[in-house]
Amino acid sequence: MLKLVILCFALFYNTVSSTRFLFGVEVKCDFDEVFQLTVSHWEDDGNTFWDRDEDITGRMTMFARKKIFFYQDGHHGFEFGKLEPYGWFLHNCTKNGNFREYRHGLSSTSGSNGLEYIEYTMSEFLKIVRANKKSDRKLDKTYLWESYLHQFEKGKTSFIPVEAFNRNLTVNFNECVKEGVIFETVVHDYDKNCDSIQVRWFARIEKVCGYRVLAQFIGADTKFWLNILSDDMFGLANAAMSDPNMDKIVYAPPLAINEEYQNDMVNYVNNCIDGEIVGQTSLSPKFDEGKALLSKHRFKVGQRLELLNYSNSTEIRVARIQEICGRRMNVSITKKDFPESLPDADDDRQVFSSGSQYWIDEGSFFIFPVGFAAVNGYQLNAKKEYIEHTNKIAQAIKNGENPRYDSDDVTFDQLAKDPIDPMIWRKVKVGQKFELIDPLAQQFNNLHVASILKFCKTEGYLIVGMDGPDALEDSFPIHINNTFMFPVGYAEKYNLELVPPDEFKGTFRWDEYLEKESAETLPLDLFKPMPSQERLDKFKVGLRLEAADMCENQFICPATVKSVHGRLINVNFDGWDEEFDELYDVDSHDILPIGWCEAHSYVLQPPKKYNY
């Protein structure tokens, strides 16, 4: 292997080392005000092509202040050395607003043309090699976390760690990916000169931010950000297992190796392997096996299930799975299953159309197995054939028999919930009160007074509604193990707004209301147990995440924790006013670590004030 490494490195070094890496910086701002900064990365092979966008190999846009400076070390000629760092600016940070262009070296960090500079260095940000390689032009507009990741390197921002969230992948990688772990990764220095051979080297994880890791090549100073779910990250010895003859995969270090080893590759490789890899914690083959399982889903496109009508929650309709993205599914009502003319898709987001997007997690309270409505006597809007089919399923379940499903039915087993302790379940009574985040609302920033209205026949399911004259009309079925129900007094204890029943007059007090209604509270042991304090402490104000908008559930947005209220976090969508903030339980599947969208080829919406 050693000979192969040296030969490969020598071959590529002679052809690639003359490339210089340059940064062009475009600045647009008002004088002395916050500006938008776009950094474009060219590979300069000796030609000058500042105006050709097709030659840009990477671009990053951020908001900053004008006292900033970018530079990049590189190689010049056929000898290792440092290219003189410089900055190339086009800006209008002048009193008269005229554009000014200049080139400035880093011999000093003081001014040129009347401006002062601070030095700003950053690691390489690798474009994601997506686990889902499906080409999609809409992904060109997805938001990336580049600027915040580089802020993290400077200690200026932080992210909620993956282990704090409820399960959001079909495979759990929390125990695999940790600081200090060594893995194999693709070295892209050689991409242009190697069409059929993949070049890899070893790297160590320095920091973990959601599904992004900051890593450093073994034996080099180069650091880079990589998504752990990309096709560029492998367990140690993956190359030997996947390509035993090493015909298509070779090991070679990055071009920017430490200077002391540039002329002594034998010692370089030996020191890397013996001194920094042998005996260290490495990414195991289970990591690669887990990634392979990500493409295997519990459900399949075309399956049918039952979907709660979000605009009429007393009704269930038949829906089909249109797309699957990890745990999330795009489901819609189709003409194939609807007994009448389909409602207008502009008025009903659950109705199928060419651009319909109704994305929910596979654990969403909105979906039920085929036969749920029939088993529980819930209003079902479906074709006659489907109603007859599900009545047979309900009868079989009642008789203790195995139902006969169609091949495309989502079954009760596929959407099974955790069993409920019978002793605890006996404590539940119709009329018991609790506090509720209305999952059918247009705003998710308060709790409501609510009651249990009736029991479903399916174990663990209840019909609940918010107290008031429209309680039955606005009621809906929900499993007791959910992220929307909270015990009486929760809002007051954690400083949240509690909305009293409609038409309630005066100041609402729980003790007075319970006495007036001759009602009791839902016992505490019926609610989800409070997470450990250790886990809750991982949700801190200012930490960043990705969050699905519960009003427009096709949108996943960059977001920030604004406040913490027990097991509820108040999330602000970056760039949006606080009136659009939403409350999420820490167990919600609608909050995600950063990098989730990137790894699943799902568009992460840019912040509202972010100019793309």
From Swiss-Prot:
Keywords: Chromosome, Nucleus, Repeat. The gene is lin-61. One of its GO terms (molecular function) is chromatin binding. One of its GO terms (cellular component) is nucleus. Synthetic multivulva class B (synMuvB) protein required to repress the induction of vulval development by Ras signaling. Unlike other synMuv proteins it does not associate with the multiprotein DRM complex and the NuRD-like complex. Interaction with methylated histone H3 is essential for vulva development. It has a role in maintaining genome stability. MBT repeats lie at residues 143-249, 263-380, 381-501, 508-607. The keyword Electron transport does not apply. The MBT repeats specifically recognize and bind histone H3 di- and tri-methylated at 'Lys-9' (H3K9me2/3). The keyword Nucleotidyltransferase does not apply. Interacts preferentially with histone H3 that is dimethylated or trimethylated at 'Lys-9'. Disruption phenotype: Multivulva phenotype in combination with loss of function of class A synMuv genes lin-8, lin-38, lin-56 and lin15A and with the class B synMuv gene hpl-2. Reduction of brood size and defects in the development of germ cells. Loss of function results in suppression of mat-3(ku233) mutant vulval phenotype. It is found in: Nucleus; Chromosome. Its main location: nucleus. GO terms for biological process: negative regulation of DNA-templated transcription; vulval development. This is Protein lin-61. InterPro entries: Mbt, PcG_chromatin_remod_factors. Changing W576A: Abolishes binding to histone H3 trimethylated at 'Lys-9'; in isoform a.
